[in-house]
């Protein structure tokens, strides 16, 4: 037996049916799409149509609303500021503002549209006396900063 004498078993590989290639092929002329109509045309898919049964979007109830005046916050934690201080990206002597945090990469805030809120998750001790000027603070974050001798502007 040689490599050029290897063949697939009979029936192991079957050519797929070529549709719409003449009436002699068995799937010619309309190519299994029926005659005329929207669904026989190319590029047509009726979105949300489930074959006549009531579609899912109609079966589920309407719920809630989107409040226009909701404030959207970028959340940062005290440990994010601690890391930036340790890296040297921020200095404890300066007032830390939203713009400064965006500049050093602590906050990703395109066009300064979102507000910045400081939380104290995973931080029970904070030693640096900082002066911060952000949009909002959690009560625990306020306590930690004021206990360390910092100021909230």
Curated annotation (Swiss-Prot):
Compositional bias of kind Gly residues: 23-35
Where are the stretches annotated Disordered? 21-41
Q: Which Pfam families match?
A: Ribosomal_L27A
Task: Output one GO MF annotation.
Answer: structural constituent of ribosome
Entry keywords, A to Z: Ribonucleoprotein, Ribosomal protein, RNA-binding, rRNA-binding
Give a GO cellular-component term: large ribosomal subunit
Task: List the InterPro entries.
Answer: Ribosomal_uL15, Ribosomal_uL15/eL18, Ribosomal_uL15/eL18_sf, Ribosomal_uL15_bac-type
Which biological process terms from the Gene Ontology are attached to this UniProt entry?
translation
Q: Which family does it belong to?
A: Belongs to the universal ribosomal protein uL15 family.
Its annotated function is as follows: Binds to the 23S rRNA.
Subunit text:
Part of the 50S ribosomal subunit.
PANTHER family linked: 50S RIBOSOMAL PROTEIN L15, LARGE RIBOSOMAL SUBUNIT PROTEIN UL15M
Q: What is this protein called?
A: Large ribosomal subunit protein uL15
* Annotated source species: Rickettsia felis (strain ATCC VR-1525 / URRWXCal2) (Rickettsia azadi)
